Structure formats: structure tokens, C-alpha cells
């Protein structure tokens, strides 16, 4: 495939910069001051290179490339399995080793060599025997937790590959006993209940079916400290939950069964007929359920054929086939608002399209909406959504419609402007309509969600307008383009409009709208519906209300009329509030902007015409009609027709807030150097040095072969030559240099025990730190934070010099030696130079010579298409990476003695420099180039760039690191030894992005300028998106062509990609009570939200589980030493830490348990929640009080219950038992209590006043 010169030059430019960074890093590394003398991050230009770098075997990359020219990656995986087992890539020794290499390599191919699952997700591959059956050999795959990162489909395919490997090796099937099967049944259910909710929770029978039929054993290592009751099953090494195996079976094989069947056919693997039958049976069962439910519905339907309006029938069909999905709203976190109930009118109005910063699971909304939801939404905030996917990040689009709000004075305002929103925010009483959510067709395709009926919008209207003009006057006009002047002038003459205006409207119909009288004129002469901007939400209101409104307007309103080319239209309407009465609400629900002045409702131009033109200027009588919506009645009687602008609404709630922040380990670390207890709780190496402490830590030491110097440095401080690693026998303590240990095959010749590269040693921080300070000439740092101990298998410490330079530049290190900055992923395909703070001249240097329409780049306002590996970072990232660049320059100059590289004085100096993008669940980074910065807490990058990390943009956050920092400082020797330690580490980097080898979700992203009429009309038929994949061009249609890299279009522009709130209010508020109050205040203001439901759901899904969980945690808590942080299941008898003598304290406090109690009471007091929920709060408080009262002896002596306590009153109401002196009578222990109680009861009866029992409402209102 031959690429255009500009694209080829771009990739060559990137490679030159990459090679330059590698050259510098190799020079630095060759000095021997690091664990390895070479750069530890290999380059890969494609998927094949990544696979070889991650899992091998050597030489496999070239063969993968050859096979990919002929086959899909699934077939390539099997072909490579064949060749590995045939020995074409070397001798691996045993059958097990052949099987292990084949499975890992195949899984790496299936996951594009990006995720760490092939390394970490498969713990082992063994050949075992069916000893309980016929003693035949079978294959067992041992899965671990990180297999989750590969995704359900790849998990399922790994099982398929395992079966293929089994056949190639001539092994028998796994023949599970009843114990094996029931063990897995228990594990799946227990994991779902006790550990983590599975995306798909299979029934016991489904698990049994799979276990009986899967030809290999799906097993694994223990991942959770949860014991099973089916213990000591033969062949299963653990009695704890095997999380990896559970995920593969439930979320892999069973959840992805339908997709797996397609691969089984494609790959030609037999023995899986049972899965096909399972899928068919499941689908048949769903069809039976559906037909039964439809049969039930048909029973209640009338058998009489009645005449129904078009929209009435559409709504009927819509509601019958696409039910509101309540799943996203079943959990509401305190402080994170519900913005719209499921499919609730007035929620987010669906608008099909893809803005410059949306698509790929991202929604664009008007920035005014962000402001008027109290800025709970900011750029990059995640929302949990009703459809098409489960989540989405929000970005700004000024061409999306904003909210319609009612002010405190009764006026109604359309707020499409961000500045207007800021101005009126404190005057808003109710949000009638939230505004548009621009959602891409590709997201519906990806999630296989039925297309909802499209709401009438400008991009639909302009196509109807152009089509009508072209047919009526035989001219050739095109929407969203600069049309030939002759065609425009000819059409303008026929339409009697200004040619300049017509040209602008055709080019940008979302911003350039005709005046209302002209819109009416167009509708009349072209017989097209009224422009959507002037169409009200007619179908939101009841026809009978419109009938009453028609009468009131006819009889009571003062109307000022105007004319335009013989067309009559209303210029102003005035009517008193008294005359309108309840119909004022009808005007509000119509979304009709109006003002209220001294008891008079005034509807000004153009909204006066928008109200009366559809009603025929009151010249025909509006009459409600059964089975007809308002628009049906209007279209039957009026010359000017309407389309419905408010059919489809989507619900959403707030998810995670946006993020753009430096990555810090907990607690923050500046150098990967162990200091043990000597550094105190802050692990301060400088403090330990100043106090002259000796640290006792497990650390690797090196010995100079020339002078014999021993220490943690890899380079001898005396001779300046590379030292040898010292290996130690853990049994006898004998030490051997690396060359000696190699001769003994790394086993002790005396004890025959495997040698370790580390042992527990005493080190002098003062001596090491002073030498490091002298080396880099850095003396003035306040603190130098190390680690308590190394988590790697080698325990090689980082040079202290690096820590000093990090401390000087105020940056922090991650577990692998790199410095990271995390940010929420956001997509962008086009930008304006002014938005990202970069000059046109600089952009030209970076290869941006033309705008997206092919015109030479001369202005900062031109829209430019983003190149696939360019990134636009947050200004917060710019500030931090500037400090990182200074650190790297200091490192080069002071530690390695090389020239400075970045020489950056301000963050703009970083433009053009390279970074690595990396997602937490992966092990392959992607090289990116910084081209600008925005004032928003997100990481903007091309959707291809995010997909290369196997991410979409539904709320994920990923990291970036400066390329040179990673090349100099990353080392595999620092990676944690535990399972998952290789995740989130750049074990390999992709240098050249190929859209064919990224996550396939981006292949569904649409790349068109507008969606055609055919699409909008098809949505009224509720079609599957798959039926329209040929109608709208997507990335998939361009794969394998040069156009996959360029020429991407968008449907909706925005004035500025950073216009909107920068930080969600959620992050700015204080405690939970304040957050919840603001959340509920907003819920009361949004028409599409029921605040009582919100309060109930917060209590049941967040606050009560938290209160009960914390209460349970208190009774099961560990105890902690304040000095060394050692934890104990039970406190030592003397109350002191046996390790360091420090004070022992609780890990769960009373305050932690009670923290949400006040908030819960506030909700119950102010909102209409169920009695059961109120009682749960009450009883939880009693449990907390009783726990702490009984913890201390003195509390037991004074256990006096509040006489107004609601729980005591409830007991009295239900049992008839009375309260005496604050104690229930059955708590009294005195033998004479009976007589005393009788006396008191008699006295009580003589009193005229009867004590009133306080209700739950009274109790909570008093609180």
C-alpha cells in the first residue's frame, strides 16, 4: 500500500526522532550505571514485532507478517501454533514447553501484542492425567487475574487455541469428575457474590454444560482469600477461588458464546457442536419469551381497528420494541447526580453525529448544559449512560442545542450560549430540557443497539431543503459544502433570497439559520417541514391542553401580526397569567421561550411565529383527536407541516470525574531505593542519613572484579568499571559473583539450593547519600523519599543520584523507574491552532501544511485534521512534563555526563517532542508526539491512538511519559515479582501506528461529513445499525487503503475544544453531606429526574451498604503499628509492636463507620423514601451506638436510651413493651421490678395526658 507523501514523511519524521532518543539512551546506558547496559524497551513497528518482543519465540515476527498477507489474525494464530509445535522456531524440550509457547504466542497475536495477558494472564500450561477416569493425558491452562485485560473474546479464544494445541500434541480430553464440575459451579457463584460482580453470571446448569464439554481444563492459581466448600478436589491445587479461571469460563466462553461459534466455524475446529446448540437453544428461549410477552400484550390490545396518526403509531411501536433501560440508574453514588431518568422526556435529546471531539464512546454536549447542571459535568467527566453503551466521556460542542430553562420569574429561556449560561445560572428554577447529546452512529453499531427514531434537527432539514430545491428548480446544490456560485445564485433567484446567505446556510446549516418568516416561506413553497429551530416540543404536551391553549389564545391574547411575501406571521403575543392559568405549564413544556412582566406573559419574535404558525395562525380550530398526537393533528390540518424534534431521549448519571494528574505511588516515591525502618514512616533517606542510622534491607549488591568494592552501585565508585552481581545461598549464606554463580548453574555447590540475587544486608544511608550528592552536585533537597523494601525479584536498587535529581525537580517515580502523568482519554480528529496554543508557523514545521478541506494553512482559526500519533495534552500535563524534561536534562548532564536534550524553559518548548502512551492493563506503549496543550483536564488524542492502547473513551484514563525518560530509566529489574507486575509497563513500544492492528472498536467510527437522508428515514423503522453499515462510511471501509490515515470528516463543529467547566463541582465540594445536598438540589431542578427516587437509590446503593460494611469491617479489623506499619490480626498482649516497639492502633475508627450517618438521616428527613429504608437507617444507627456503648465498661453502666429514640418507639408500637428509665422492661434484672412496673403503670394510667408515639418522619425532621 503506497501512502501519500505527506503521511510517509510524517512517519519518517517520527522515526527520526525515535532513533535520536534511542541513540542518546544507548550512550547513557552503555556507561553501566543502570541494571542493564542496554535500553530495555524494544521498538516494534507492527503487531508482529510486539508479539515477538512480548512472548517470542525469536524469529516469529517475520513469519506472522508473511501469514497476515493471506489470513486473518485468528487463522494466523493457529498457523503459528502449528509451526511452533512442528519445531520451526527451535526446540523447547518438553511437550509442556511447546504447548506453553504456542498458547502464549497465539494469545498475543489475538490481542495484537498489546495487553499483558499472554505474559501474566496465563500462569502456567501443564499436561496432566485423568487419574480419576482412565489415566489419559490432557492439557490444563492455568489462568491468573490479569487474563481480564485481554477481554472476553480473547479469553474465550485462548480456550479454543488450547484445544487446538491439545489436538496437535495428540492429547486426550479433560474428563472432569462430578467434584470438578460442582467445584466450578460453586466458585462462579461465590466469586460473583463475595469478590466482584461478573458481567455475565451464568446459571449452574450453564457452568455444568461447559465443564462437561470443554476439552481442556480451565484452572488457575488462587487469586482471592475466599475458601470453597468443595475442598481437596483431585488435580486442583488450591481450595481458594481461582479468579482467572472463573473469568475465562463465565465472561469468556459463556458470555461470548455467540461470537465464539463464528470463530469455531472460521478456524475449522470441531468438537464444539455443544456450544452451537447452547447458543441456538438460548436464542430460541429468548424468542419464546418475547413471543409470549407479545401474546400477553395482544390480549390487552383492542381488537377494533382504529385510525391512528403517524406519530402516534411511531410512539406506540417505539415503546413496544425499545423499553427504557433502568440498569444505569439502579446505583447512584452520593454526590454524583442523576441527570436524566431512563428515556425520560426532557433528558438528553439524542442527536446522531460525531463532533470533532466525540465518537468512540464519547458524547458531545453544549457547554451551557455543563454550566447549568451546576458544573457537575466538566470536559472529560464520565457519565454512566442508558444507551448505546454503558458509559461515555463528555466533550463540548457548541453546535449541539443547549438547555431550555425556566427562570425564577417564570420566564423560559433557550440557552445555547456558554456566556449566557454563566450569566443566568443563579436565576434558574427548573431545567425543562437538558439539551442535545451528539452520539455517533458507530457507537450504535459497536453496541448493536437498535437505532432510535431520529429527532428533527438542522442537518436533516438542510438535506430535505436541498433535495426539494434540486428537484423543483433542477439545480445542483450540496449541503455542508461550498457550492458553485452559479448554482447558488440560480437557486437564490428562484427562492427570492440573498445568494450570500444561501451559500452560508448550505455550508454551515448548524450555525446559519433562516429567519422564522423565511423558514415559513421555504416550508410553503418547497413543501418541506418547518425548520427544526422553530419547531417546538409539540408532542410533549397533551392534545387536550393544546385545544384549551388554542381557545385561550384565540379569545384572550393580544397578537401583533406581520407579513412576509404574503405570509402572515405573529410578531408578538401578550396574554395575562390569570387567563393562561395552568396552560402556562403547557407553554413551558413546549419549550417556548417567553418572558413574564407584571403578570403578563410575553412571547416575542421569532417564538410568537413558532407558536402560532403550526396552529394556522388560529384560523382553523384545533381539536384533540383520539390516537393522534399534537403533531399528527397539526399535519392533518395545517399547510406548514412539522416533524417531531423530541421523540428519543436518553438517560445518564455522573460517573467518575475527569482527571489530569501526575502519577504517584502510595505513598509517593522519588527513588526506588530501600530504606526499611531507618527512614521512619515517611521513608526519608536524607533523614536516615542525617541521623546516622543503619538500614537493614533486602537488596542486591555488586562486587568490583578489580578492587573488590561491594555495594548497591552497578558501577564501581573507585575504579569506574562495571561490577558483578553477587548471588547468595539462602541456606548457608555463601556468596558468589555472577560469573561464579553461572558456572554452578545458579545453585549453591555446598547445599544444592538455588541462589538468590539478593540477601538481607546492612547499609549506611549517610555514606551512600553523601557520595550520590557529590556525584550530581545536588545538596539542597529537603527530603528524599525511598521505599520500605523492593518488590522486584532481583531487588536491584535505583541509583540514589536519580532520586536526588527527581527531588530537585519535584517529580515522582513509578514502580518501573518511569515518571507518569495520568489523564482521562478523550478523542479528537480535528483542531484549530488557536485552541491548542500553537502558531501556524510551528504547525507547518510539524508537517501541518493544509486544513481539512485542502486549503493552505494560514490562519489560527482554520480546522486541521490531526495526524494519528499526535497528542494534545492538558496544560497540567505540560507543567509536569516540563519538570520531567528538566529532570531528564539534569540526569543526562550530571549523572551520565552527556549534553542536555530538551532545554525546555516553558511547556510550549515541549511541542514536537515524543511521549509514550500506555494503558494500565497493557504492556505495549505507543509513541506519540506533543503538538499542543489545552486548558482541560483530559488527554486529547486521535481515536486510533487510544485504540492502539486497546482503549475507548468511555471514561478510561491512561498515562503518558516522555520517551527519553522511559528509555533512560525503565528497567524490567524494578518490576514487582507478584502476578500482574508486568502490567502497566512499557515492555515494548509501537513506533508506527497501523489502524488495522488497533482495537477493532475504532473500526466502527464513522468518518462522514453528514448522515444521509436515508439514515434518518431508516431510524423511523427502528432498524438495526448493521442494516445501515453501507449507508454511512466507517473506518472499517477504509482499512487497507491510504485513506485510513487521512480524510476523516466530522458532522458537528465546536467553537473551542476546551470551552466549558474545567473541573467538576464534585471534586470541589467538601464532605459527603455537602455533595449530596447539591446533588439533590440539582435533582429537584431537572424535570427529567425524580428527586425522591434519587434519595432512595443513594441510600440503598451507596450509604447503607457503606454504613453496614464499615460496621462489619470494624469487628473484623486488623491492628497497625504507627511506626513500621506492620499489621496484626490480633493486638500483641503488651500493646506494643514486636518488630519496632511502636504503638498499636486500630485500622478502622468509629468516625469511619459513622461518616455517612448524618447524610443518610438528612435524606430520610427531606425526601419521600420507603418506610423500610427509613427503618434500615434507624437500626444501623442503633447497631453503631450499641457497638461502641458495649466496647467500654463505663458505657455499660450508663446505657440509658434516649426517651425520644425512634427505634425504642418502634419496638413499643410493635411489641407493646414499655420503656422504663430508658431501658426495656425485659432488660431489668431486679426481682422486684415486676411490682415497681405495675405501680408505675397505674400512675401513668391516672395521668390525663397520653404520651404520643413519634413517627419516623417526626424523628428525622427533629434531627
From Swiss-Prot:
Q: Which residues lie in Basic and acidic residues bias regions? A: 1235-1244
Q: Which Pfam families match?
A: PolC_DP2_cat, PolC_DP2_central, PolC_DP2_N
Q: What is its EC number?
A: 2.7.7.7, 3.1.11.1
Region Disordered, annotated ranges: 1224-1250
**Which keywords does the record carry?**
DNA replication, DNA-binding, DNA-directed DNA polymerase, Exonuclease, Hydrolase, Multifunctional enzyme, Nuclease, Nucleotidyltransferase, Transferase
Q: Where are the transmembrane segments?
A: none
GO MF term list:
DNA binding; DNA-directed DNA polymerase activity; single-stranded DNA 3'-5' DNA exonuclease activity
Which reaction is catalysed here?
DNA(n) + a 2'-deoxyribonucleoside 5'-triphosphate = DNA(n+1) + diphosphate; Exonucleolytic cleavage in the 3'- to 5'-direction to yield nucleoside 5'-phosphates
One of the GO BP terms on file? DNA-templated DNA replication
Coiled coil stretches, renumbered: none
Task: Describe the subunit structure.
Answer: Heterodimer of a large subunit and a small subunit.
- Entry function: Possesses two activities: a DNA synthesis (polymerase) and an exonucleolytic activity that degrades single-stranded DNA in the 3'- to 5'-direction. Has a template-primer preference which is characteristic of a replicative DNA polymerase.
Similarity comment text for this entry: Belongs to the archaeal DNA polymerase II family.
Q: Which PANTHER family match?
A: DNA POLYMERASE II LARGE SUBUNIT
NCBIfam families, alphabetically? Answer: polC, PRK04023.1
Name by which UniProt lists this protein: DNA polymerase II large subunit
Origin organism of this chain?
Pyrococcus furiosus (strain ATCC 43587 / DSM 3638 / JCM 8422 / Vc1)
Lineage, broadest ranks: Archaea, Methanobacteriati, Methanobacteriota, Thermococci, Thermococcales
Amino acid at each position: 500500500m503506497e501512502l501519500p507523501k505527506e503521511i510517509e514523511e510524517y512517519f519518517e519524521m517520527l522515526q527520526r526522532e525515535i532513533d535520536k532518543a534511542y541513540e542518546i539512551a544507548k550512550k547513557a546506558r552503555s556507561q553501566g550505571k543502570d541494571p542493564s547496559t542496554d535500553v530495555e524497551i524494544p521498538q516494534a513497528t507492527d503487531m508482529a514485532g510486539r508479539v515477538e518482543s512480548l512472548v517470542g519465540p525469536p524469529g516469529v515476527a517475520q513469519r506472522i507478517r508473511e501469514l497476515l498477507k493471506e489470513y486473518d489474525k485468528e487463522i494466523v494464530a493457529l498457523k503459528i501454533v502449528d509451526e511452533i509445535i512442528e519445531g520451526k522456531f527451535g526446540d523447547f524440550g518438553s511437550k509442556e514447553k511447546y504447548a506453553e509457547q504456542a498458547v502464549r504466542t497465539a494469545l498475543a497475536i489475538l490481542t495484537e501484542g498489546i495487553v499483558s495477558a499472554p505474559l501474566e494472564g496465563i500462569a502456567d500450561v501443564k499436561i496432566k492425567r485423568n487419574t480419576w477416569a482412565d489415566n489419559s493425558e490432557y492439557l490444563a491452562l492455568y489462568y491468573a487475574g490479569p487474563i481480564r485485560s485481554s477481554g472476553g473474546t480473547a479469553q474465550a479464544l485462548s480456550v479454543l487455541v488450547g484445544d487446538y494445541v491439545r489436538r496437535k500434541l495428540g492429547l486426550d480430553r479433560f474428563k472432569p469428575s462430578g467434584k470438578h464440575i460442582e467445584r466450578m459451579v460453586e466458585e462462579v457463584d461465590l466469586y460473583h457474590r463475595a469478590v466482584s460482580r461478573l458481567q455475565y453470571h451464568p446459571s449452574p446448569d450453564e457452568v455444568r454444560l461447559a465443564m462437561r464439554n470443554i476439552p481442556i481444563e480451565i484452572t488457575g492459581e488462587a487469586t482471592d482469600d475466599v475458601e470453597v466448600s468443595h475442598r481437596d478436589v483431585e488435580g486442583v491445587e488450591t481450595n481458594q477461588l481461582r479468579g482467572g479461571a472463573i473469568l475465562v469460563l463465565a465472561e469468556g466462553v459463556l458470555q461470548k458464546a455467540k461470537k465464539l461459534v463464528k470463530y469455531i466455524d472460521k478456524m475449522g475446529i470441531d468438537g464444539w457442536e455443544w456450544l452451537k446448540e447452547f447458543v441456538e437453544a438460548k436464542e430460541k428461549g429468548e424468542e419464546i419469551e418475547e413471543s409470549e410477552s407479545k401474546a400477553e400484550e395482544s390480549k390487552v390490545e383492542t381488537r377494533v381497528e382504529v385510525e391512528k396518526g403517524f406519530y402516534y403509531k411511531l410512539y406506540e411501536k417505539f415503546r413496544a420494541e425499545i423499553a427504557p433501560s433502568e440498569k444505569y440508574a439502579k446505583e447512584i453514588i452520593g454526590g454524583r447526580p442523576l441527570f436524566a431518568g431512563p428515556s425520560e422526556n426532557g433528558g438528553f435529546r439524542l442527536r446522531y453525529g460525531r463532533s470533532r471531539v466525540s465518537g468512540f464512546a464519547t458524547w458531545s454536549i453544549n457547554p451551557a448544559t455543563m454550566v447549568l447542571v451546576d458544573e457537575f459535568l466538566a470536559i472529560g467527566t464520565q457519565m454512566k449512560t442508558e444507551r448505546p453503551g454503558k458509559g461515555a466521556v463528555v466533550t463540548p460542542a457548541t453546535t449541539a442545542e443547549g438547555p431550555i430553562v425556566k427562570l425564577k420569574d417564570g420566564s423560559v429561556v433557550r440557552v445555547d450560549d456558554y456566556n449566557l449560561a454563566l450569566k443566568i445560572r443563579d436565576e434558574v428554577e427548573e431545567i425543562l430540557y437538558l439539551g442535545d447529546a451528539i452520539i455517533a452512529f458507530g457507537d450504535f453499531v459497536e453496541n448493536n443497539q437498535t437505532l432510535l427514531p431520529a429527532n428533527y434537527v438542522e442537518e436533516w432539514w438542510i438535506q430535505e431543503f436541498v433535495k426539494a430545491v434540486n428537484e423543483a428548480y433542477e439545480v445542483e446544490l450540496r449541503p455542508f459544502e461550498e457550492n458553485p456560485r452559479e448554482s447558488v445564485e440560480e437557486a437564490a433567484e428562484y427562492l427570492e433570497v440573498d445568494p450570500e446567505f444561501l451559500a452560508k446556510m448550505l455550508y454551515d446549516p448548524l450555525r446559519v439559520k433562516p429567519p422564522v418568516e423565511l423558514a415559513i416561506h421555504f416550508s410553503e413553497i418547497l413543501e418541506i417541514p418547518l425548520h427544526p429551530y422553530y419547531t417546538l416540543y409539540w408532542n410533549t404536551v397533551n392534545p387536550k391542553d393544546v385545544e384549551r391553549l388554542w381557545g385561550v389564545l384565540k379569545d384572550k391574547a393580544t397578537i401583533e401580526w406581520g407579513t412576509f411575501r404574503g405570509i402572515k406571521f405573529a410578531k408578538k403575543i401578550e396574554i395575562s397569567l390569570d387567563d393562561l392559568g395552568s396552560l402556562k405549564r403547557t407553554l413551558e413544556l413546549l419549550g417556548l421561550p417567553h418572558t413574564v412582566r407584571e403578570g403578563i406573559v410575553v412571547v416575542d419574535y421569532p417564538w410568537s411565529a413558532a407558536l402560532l404558525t403550526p396552529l394556522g395562525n388560529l384560523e382553523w380550530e384545533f381539536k384533540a383527536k383520539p390516537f393522534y398526537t399534537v403533531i399528527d393533528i397539526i399535519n392533518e390540518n395545517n399547510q406548514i407541516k412539522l416533524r417531531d424534534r423530541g421523540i428519543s431521549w436518553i438517560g445518564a448519571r455522573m460517573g467518575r470525574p475527569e482527571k489530569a494528574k501526575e502519577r504517584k505511588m502510595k505513598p509517593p516515591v522519588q527513588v526506588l531505593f530501600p530504606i526499611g525502618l531507618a527512614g521512619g514512616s515517611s521513608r526519608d533517606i536524607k533523614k536516615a542519613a542525617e541521623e546516622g542510622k543503619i538500614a537493614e534491607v533486602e537488596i542486591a549488591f555488586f562486587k568490583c572484579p578489580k578492587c573488590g568494592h561491594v555495594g548497591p552501585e552497578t558501577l564501581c565508585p573507585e575504579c569506574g568499571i562495571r561490577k558483578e552481581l553477587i548471588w547468595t545461598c539462602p541456606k548457608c549464606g555463601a556468596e558468589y559473583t555472577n560469573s561464579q554463580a553461572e558456572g554452578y548453574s545458579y545453585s549453591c555447590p555446598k547445599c544444592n539450593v538455588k541462589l538468590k540475587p539478593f540477601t538481607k544486608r546492612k547499609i549506611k544511608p549517610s555514606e551512600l547519600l553523601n557520595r550520590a550528592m557529590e556525584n550530581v552536585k545536588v545538596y539542597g533537597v529537603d527530603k528524599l523519599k525511598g521505599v520500605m523494601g523492593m518488590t522486584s525479584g532481583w531487588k536491584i536498587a535505583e541509583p540514589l543520584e536519580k532520586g536526588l535529581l527527581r527531588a530537585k525537580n519535584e517529580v515522582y517515580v513509578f514502580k518501573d523507574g518511569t515518571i507518569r502523568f495520568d489523564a482521562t482519554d478523550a478523542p479528537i480528529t480535528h483542531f484549530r491552532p488557536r485552541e491548542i496554543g500553537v502558531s501556524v508557523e510551528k504547525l507547518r514545521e510539524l508537517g501541518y501544511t493544509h486544513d481539512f478541506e485542502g486549503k493552505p494553512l494560514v490562519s489560527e482559526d482554520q480546522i486541521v485534521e490531526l495526524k494519528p500519533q499526535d497528542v494534545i495534552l492538558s496544560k497540567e500535563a505540560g507543567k509536569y512534563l516540563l519538570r520531567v524534561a528538566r529532570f531528564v536534562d539534569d540526569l543526562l548532564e550530571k549523572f551520565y555526563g552527556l549534553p542536555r536534550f530538551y532545554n525546555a524553559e516553558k511547556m510550549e518548548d515541549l511541542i514536537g517532542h515524543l511521549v509514550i502512551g500506555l494503558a494500565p492493563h497493557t504492556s505495549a506503549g505507543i509513541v506519540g508526539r506533543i503538538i499542543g496543550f489545552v486548558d482541560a483536564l483530559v488527554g486529547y488524542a486521535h481515536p486510533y491512538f487510544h485504540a492502539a492502547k486497546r482503549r475507548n473513551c468511555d471514561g478510561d484514563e491512561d498515562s503518558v511519559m516522555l520517551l527519553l525518560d522511559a528509555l533512560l530509566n525503565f528497567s524490567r529489574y524494578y518490576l514487582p515479582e507478584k502476578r500482574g507486575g508486568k502490567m502497566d509497563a512499557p515492555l515494548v513500544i509501537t513506533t508506527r501506528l497501523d489502524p488495522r492492528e488497533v482495537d477493532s472498536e475504532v473500526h466502527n467510527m464513522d468518518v462522514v461529513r453528514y448522515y444521509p437522508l436515508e439514515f434518518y428515514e431508516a431510524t423511523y423503522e427502528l432498524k438495526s445499525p448493521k442494516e445501515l453499515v453501507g449507508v454511512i462510511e466507517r473506518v472499517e471501509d477504509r482499512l487497507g487503503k491510504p485513506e485510513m490515515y487521512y480524510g476523516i470528516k466530522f458532522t458537528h463543529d465546536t467553537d473551542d475544544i476546551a470551552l466549558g467547566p474545567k473541573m467538576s463541582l464534585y471534586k470541589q465540594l467538601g464532605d459527603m453531606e455537602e455533595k449530596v445536598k447539591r446533588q439533590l438540589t440539582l435533582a429537584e431542578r431537572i424535570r427529567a429526574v425524580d428527586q425522591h427516587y434519587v434519595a432512595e437509590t443513594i441510600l440503598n446503593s451507596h450509604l447503607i451498604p457503606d454504613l453496614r460494611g464499615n460496621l462489619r469491617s470494624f469487628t473484623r479489623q486488623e491492628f497497625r503499628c504507627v511506626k513500621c506499619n506492620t499489621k496484626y490480626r490480633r493486638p500483641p498482649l503488651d500493646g506494643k509492636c514486636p518488630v519496632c516497639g511502636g504503638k498499636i492502633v486500630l485500622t478502622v475508627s468509629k468516625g469511619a463507620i459513622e461518616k455517612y450517618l448524618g447524610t443518610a438521616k438528612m435524606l430520610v428527613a427531606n425526601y419521600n423514601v420507603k418506610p423500610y429504608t427509613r427503618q434500615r437507617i434507624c437500626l444501623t444507627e442503633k447497631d453503631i451506638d450499641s457497638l461502641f456503648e458495649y466496647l467500654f465498661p463505663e458505657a455499660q453502666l450508663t446505657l440509658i436510651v434516649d426517651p425520644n429514640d425512634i427505634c425504642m418507639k418502634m419496638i413499643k408500637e410493635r411489641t407493646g413493651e414499655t420503656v422504663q428509665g430508658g431501658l426495656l422492661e425485659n432488660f431489668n434484672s431486679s426481682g422486684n421490678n415486676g411490682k415497681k412496673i405495675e405501680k408505675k403503670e397505674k400512675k401513668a394510667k391516672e395521668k390525663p395526658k397520653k404520651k404520643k408515639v413519634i413517627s419516623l418522619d417526626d424523628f428525622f425532621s427533629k434531627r
